[in-house]
């Protein structure tokens, strides 16, 4: 995998960091198959703005308040991590938006090539982050393609004094460059 080291974004109103997750471990609490997400019991789950599939390629955004999200993720594949979903944040709190993908098409060398566009929109509609074609995952998968993998960019938000209150929107567009499939994903949280 080719790691992406993202710059630090500092503004007087907020502080975002894109972190690089240098791991792409899989787990089996849900998967995408035949064009839909399935829960741990194998039942189809409907697409949402933050979790959807196109064909057999799936993507999912999850915003968590877990400071130990990386430790929870780095578990054996048979252990399903449990993340606390964050929908609201207050001054001094930190949250993380994780991007997951499943079932990318592999090229002739059995490698995946996934990039993504990242956009974070403040409550007033202005953009805090707008990056295109960020490397999400490139290389060989460690497990089956249908398992769930963590994409490299992780958005880390720390609510600081002066940050605008209201709804912050995160839009990530996953691109399976081998399959030529694009999945737009969106999630939001409220800063109180």
Q: Where would I find each of the regions flagged by the language model?
A:
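Intrinsically disordered, low-complexity terminal regions enriched in Ser/Thr/Pro/Gly
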Residues: 35-192
């Amino acid at each position: 995998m080719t790691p992406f080291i993202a710059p630090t974004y500092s503004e007087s109103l907020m502080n975002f960091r894109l972190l690089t997750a240098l791991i792409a471990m899989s787990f089996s609490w849900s998967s995408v198959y035949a064009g839909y997400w399935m829960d741990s019991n194998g039942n189809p789950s409907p697409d949402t703005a933050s979790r959807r599939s196109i064909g057999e390629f799936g993507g999912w955004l999850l915003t968590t308040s877990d400071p130990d999200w990386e430790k929870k993720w780095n578990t054996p594949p048979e252990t399903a991590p449990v993340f606390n979903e964050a929908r609201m944040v207050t001054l001094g709190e930190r949250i993380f938006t994780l991007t997951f993908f499943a079932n990318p098409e592999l090229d002739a060398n059995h490698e995946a090539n996934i990039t993504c566009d990242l956009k974070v929109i403040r409550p007033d509609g202005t953009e805090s982050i707008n990056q295109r074609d960020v490397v999400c995952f490139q290389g060989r998968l460690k497990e089956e393609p249908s398992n769930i993998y963590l994409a490299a960019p992780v958005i880390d938000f720390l609510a600081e004094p002066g940050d605008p209150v209201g709804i912050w929107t995160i839009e990530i567009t996953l691109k399976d460059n081998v399959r030529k499939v694009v999945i737009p994903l969106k999630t939001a949280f409220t800063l109180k």
